[in-house]
Curated annotation (Swiss-Prot):
This is Insulin-like growth factor-binding protein 1. The lineage of its organism: Eukaryota, Metazoa, Chordata, Craniata, Vertebrata. Disulfide bonds join 32-59, 35-61, 43-62, 50-65, 73-86, 80-106, 180-210, 221-232, 234-255. InterPro entries: Growth_fac_rcpt_cys_sf, IGFBP-like, IGFBP1, IGFBP_1-6_chordata, Insulin_GF-bd_Cys-rich_CS, Thyroglobulin_1, Thyroglobulin_1_sf. PANTHER family: INSULIN-LIKE GROWTH FACTOR BINDING PROTEIN, INSULIN-LIKE GROWTH FACTOR-BINDING PROTEIN 1. Residues 177-255 form the Thyroglobulin type-1 domain. A motif (Cell attachment site) lies at residues 250-252. GO terms for molecular function: insulin-like growth factor I binding; insulin-like growth factor II binding. It holds the Pfam family IGFBP. Keywords: Disulfide bond, Growth factor binding, Phosphoprotein, Secreted, Signal.
Length: 263
């Protein structure tokens, strides 16, 4: 009887990881790389007018000003001040999508809801069978994953593609014609096993950036938990192989230039 893909409770990839059964063991938490004294020394001074400090978005080490009530917020912005939470605006048809684009707002969190959130959004308390991501879970995990706004489309594409794979049986994987989706499944499988061995020490990894048709976006990037964006490079959409002459950079590698040259 083939196994069925299900969501593992990773704090990094809450809806992306793979439940591989008892052979893998209990899921291990993913955490940012430790903040060394050298990294902390590079932090810019915080303005004296800042009423409240909060952790940096992503895996940055530098403190920053918390966002006040009503401020625009999202997964790649600063965090909301104590007692507030970043929520999609009322009536927003795609609340999670809005948060990935910084279109939420810092709103008051009722005390009873704050207690519930603390109890339920912890990765250890998320059911592996759950296919739903709450706004709180999205923010908790994407704040860790997304070092910059450039990371968000890649991470969101990975979630969207994995959602389309979750209901498929492992025995079907070899039959898939879509190369990027095949690789995404294999990468998630490998990462789940590597994380069990590495514990908290796996700070960089690569997730294939697939389009809705299962092929590759020309821009591919690694995810880094070391406080700075990972490297990005350009690939051929049909194969995922790096384009000859393309250079891996931190930021936008401007992949379209290579296709313009070919045309």
């Amino acid at each position: 009887m083939p196994e069925v893909l299900a969501v593992r409770a990773w704090p990094l990839l809450l809806s992306l990881a793979v439940q591989l059964g008892a052979t893998v063991g209990a899921p291990q938490p993913w955490r940012c790389a430790p903040c060394s004294a050298e990294r902390m020394a590079l932090c810019p001074p915080v303005p004296a007018s800042c009423p409240e400090l909060t952790r940096s978005a992503g895996c940055g080490c530098c403190p920053m000003c918390a966002l006040p009530l009503g401020a625009a917020c999202g997964v790649a912005t600063a965090r909301c001040a104590r007692g507030l939470s970043c929520r999609a605006l009322p009536g927003e048809p795609r609340p999670l999508h809005a948060l990935t684009r910084g279109q939420g707002a810092c709103m008051t969190t009722p005390s009873d809801e704050a207690t519930d959130t603390k109890d339920t959004t912890s990765p250890e308390n998320v059911s592996p069978e759950s296919s739903e991501i709450t706004q709180e879970q999205l923010l908790d995990n994407f704040h860790l994953m997304a070092e910059s706004s450039e990371d968000l489309p890649i991470l969101w594409n990975a979630i969207s593609n994995y959602e389309s794979l979750r209901a498929l049986e492992i025995s079907d994987v070899k039959k898939w014609k879509e190369p990027c989706q095949r690789e995404l499944y294999k990468v998630l499988d490998r990462l789940a096993r590597e994380q069990q061995k590495a514990g908290d020490k796996l700070y960089k990894f690569y997730l294939p950036n697939c389009n809705k048709n299962g092929f590759y976006h020309s821009k591919q990037c690694e995810t880094s938990l070391e406080g700075e964006p990972g490297l990005c490079w350009c690939v051929y959409p049909w194969s995922g192989k790096r384009i000859l002459g393309s250079v891996a950079v931190r930021g936008d590698p401007k992949c379209q230039q290579y296709f313009n040259l070919q045309n």
